[in-house]
Amino acid sequence: MPGTVLLLAASPVGKGCLVDAASVLPVLAAVPPAVLAGTDTANVVELADPLEPQAVLTRLRAAAAAPGPLTVFVTGQLQLDRKQRLPHLALARTTPSTVRYTGFPWHWFREELRLRSAGTTTLLLDLHVDAATWAWLRGRGLECGPGVAVYGRVAPPVGRRKVAAPTYMKAVDDRVAERRAAGAGAVASAGAGPDRGRGRGGGPGAVGWRCGRRWWPRCGFRPRGPFPPCPRGPRHQPSGSS
């Protein structure tokens, strides 16, 4: 059965940018789709610096509804909206004062992926955060949905007016290249990505690990720290509801 791959790289334009997210897309897009998906054939959807959260939701919803394995690569930065203090993936037009309206609410990932069969969905995340979001994540968490295998890292701020590189995703590409050279196959089925802690994709202060049966069962994605239950966010509007 064909697989589906969603490549999403987003970061704000201007001084609010924390990571050069879009720079990783040419690297990942050069990998054969079947290798990214871990299937014989695959369809790839690429979103580079999208402007509208609804456009991202439409693509994510279509990918989640597709049969077969789904692999989602997300590179970018998280910010909290000022009213509800919930994490959003910052898009091209996101500013600190407009996060709630121009960012992509993280809980939409969870809501769109929650109905997929366990073991058919993989997320690879390379996320950067500001100081406020880092503190929020340490006390809560970043849920991605039940039955979703999560690999990646959350990196703290790199300093004022500095733009970080998506080193985790570049490490994923290196791992894929190694496996292709060894004839081992695909990223989605191989447990790709650096090991837990400050591995090849980490960096100073970065927190990254592999989620799944071998590492952290269905945990979502969290930095180190106490893990009280994550409060529920605003209700997500499912497809077809009014």
Question: Where in this protein do the model-derived segments appear?
Answer:
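Boundary/activation segment at the start of structured domains
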Residues: 1-69, 228-231, 242
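Extracytoplasmic/secreted cell-surface and envelope-processing proteins
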Residues: 17, 81-83, 132-136
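Active-site-proximal C-terminal subdomain of hydrolase catalytic domains
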Residues: 128-215
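Short beta-strand segments
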Residues: 8-9, 72-77, 124-126
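Proline/glycine-rich low-complexity loops and linkers
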Residues: 112-135
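A short, glycine/acidic-enriched catalytic loop
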Residues: 77-110
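Extended non-globular C-terminal regions
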Residues: 205-242
